[in-house]
Each structure stands twice: as C-alpha cells, then as structure tokens.
Curated annotation (Swiss-Prot):
It is a multi-pass membrane protein. Belongs to the binding-protein-dependent transport system permease family. CysTW subfamily. The lineage of its organism: Bacteria, Bacillati, Bacillota, Bacilli, Bacillales. Involved in a multicomponent binding-protein-dependent transport system for glycine betaine; probably responsible for the translocation of the substrate across the membrane. This is Glycine betaine transport system permease protein OpuAB. Signal peptide: none annotated. It comes from the Bacteria. The gene is opuAB. It holds the Pfam family BPD_transp_1. The chain crosses the membrane at residues 19-39, 45-65, 70-90, 94-114, 138-158, 216-236, 243-263. GO terms for biological process: amino acid transport; carnitine transmembrane transport; choline transport; glycine betaine transport. GO terms for molecular function: amine transmembrane transporter activity; carnitine transmembrane transporter activity. GO terms for cellular component: ATP-binding cassette (ABC) transporter complex. Keywords: Amino-acid transport, Cell membrane, Membrane, Transmembrane, Transmembrane helix, Transport. SUPFAM superfamilies: MetI-like.
C-alpha cells in the first residue's frame, strides 16, 4: 500500500527558526540582557533585606491584604523555608514568577482590552490562546533556548507564554460582562470610547481581571521546575536536581517550599479580589 508523501514540517520549522536567529540575533540578545538584568535586580534587591525582616514584611502584607490566618501561615512558612536553607532559591523563584507575571499583565491586559473592543481581533486572538494553553510546556523551551540560550531568560519566556492566556481571557470576559444598559447610558451622555473604557468598563471588570492575574501567577509558579531544565535557578532547580540525583528528601523539602510560596501568593491575590468586591458593595 502506497503511503502519502511526508510533509517536511520539521525541516521547515528548523529553517525558519535558524533564519530568525541569524537575522534578529542582536534583538534577542538585547531582550535577554534586559530580562536577565531585571530578574537579577529583583533578586539583589530582595537579598539586601535580612530574611527575618523580609519574612515579617511578607506576613504584614498578608495580614493587611488577606487575613490573620494567611499572615500566620506566611510567617511560619517563610521561616521554615529559611531554616531549611532554601531562602535564596525562593527569592530567585519569586523573581522569575514576578517578572513573568508583570510581562503577562503589561502585554496581556492591553491585548484583552483590544480584543474586547474589536470582534475581529478576538477571533484572531482566541485560537492563538488555545494553542498557547494546549501546547505542551516543554515545546516552549525549544525556541526559547534557540533565541535566548540557557539560563533564566528562556525560563521567563516559557513562563510568560504559559501564564499569559488567563489574563487576556479574563480581561475580555470582564469587559464583555459589563451590563449593556450601562454602556447605553454612557453613550446617551456622549461619553467617548476612552471615557467609557476607563471610567465604566475597566472598573467594573477589575474583579474578573484580578482573577485572571491570580491564575497567571499560579501558572507561572507551576513552570518553575520546567524552567529549571533550561538553567533557570530557584526552587525548581532544586527539585530538578533532586529528581536527577534520586534525592527524595531534598526534592520533598524544595517541593514544600514551592507549595508554601504558591499558597501564600494564591491566598493574597484572591483576597485582593474579595476586598475589591466588599468595598464596591459598601
């Protein structure tokens, strides 16, 4: 039985990636240097603060934004991380996650706003987001390595690709959920598109957008172990090293540290959303 001719898709993609690397190598080097400097700046800045003082700051922030229970959990959890010897890797992980989330917000929210205002843009963006969310995370690492070499930068890039879709989707959803009668009222009073967006739609969509940002934070944090495979430092690197060297105890310790950070960030960002809601109802 004759087989259909094979489509050389892999060869085409490899040639395309090689062409981009050769043509825009300087551009990608600039991005890599900028991202690396930003991440290192966060790590250095947090590293100047004594671990005990920074733990108290995190606990106070959790108390102010969230609840006493979360503040106590943050205090005990971060002290445990410090006494286990994973303080510096935790700071590196926080820097990677923070950088990824900032980029996701800065890029994702405007795209979400644009897609909510233009149906054509939404139809184009939606399948791209589907691809970003369904593509295996390991696949993101391949072009990231080609363009940015080994280190923290490809980890950040892969995390951004994986974590950005919820921010875009929830921004679109939040703006679309604004009641039509409010939109009609603003139009009746002669509001411009910008006035309607910034004074009505975005304030009412804030809760939904924050929910998307919360999801992006969790997805970025879930990428730390995968990012470690391309040289990104942090708690993920500790877990990856423990797996490759069959050190179960070390892997469990680093895993506990990741869980503590994840729960802390999740509860704090969730309670930002709740406080926004309660103030709006007051």
């Amino acid at each position: 039985m004759d087989r259909l001719p094979r489509i050389p898709l892999a060869d085409i993609i490899d040639r395309f990636v090689d062409w981009i690397t050769m043509t825009f190598g300087g551009f990608f080097d600039g991005i890599a240097n900028g991202l690396a400097a930003f991440v290192n700046g966060i790590v250095t800045g947090l590293g100047f603060i004594p671990s005990i003082l920074l733990t108290i700051i995190f606990a106070a922030l959790a108390w102010w934004i969230s609840t006493r229970g979360i503040a106590l959990f943050t205090l005990i959890g971060f002290l445990l991380i410090d006494y286990l010897g994973y303080w510096d890797p935790m700071l590196q992980t926080l820097a990677l996650v923070l950088t990824s989330v900032i980029i996701s917000i800065v890029v994702g929210v405007p795209i979400g706003i644009w897609a909510s205002q233009k149906e054509t843009v939404r139809r184009i963006v939606t399948p791209i987001l589907d691809l970003m969310q369904t593509m295996p995370a390991f696949v993101y690492l391949l072009p990231a390595i080609f363009f940015f070499n080994i280190g923290v930068v490809p980890g950040v890039v892969a995390s951004v690709i994986f974590a950005m879709p919820p921010t875009i989707r929830m921004t679109v959803l939040g703006i679309k959920q604004v009641p039509a009668d409010l939109i009609e009222a603003t139009e009746a009073f002669g509001s411009t598109t910008a006035q309607r967006l910034f004074k009505v739609q975005l304030p009412l969509a804030t809760k939904t957008i924050l929910a998307g940002i919360n999801q992006s934070i969790m997805l970025a944090l879930s990428m730390v172990v995968i990012a470690a495979m391309v040289g990104a430092p942090g708690l993920g690197s500790e877990v990856y090293s423990a797996v490759t060297q069959l050190k179960t105890g070390v892997g469990v310790e680093a895993g506990i540290a990741i869980v503590i950070v994840a729960i802390t960030l999740d509860r704090i960002t969730q309670n930002i959303k709740v406080k926004k809601k309660s103030r709006g109802n007051a």
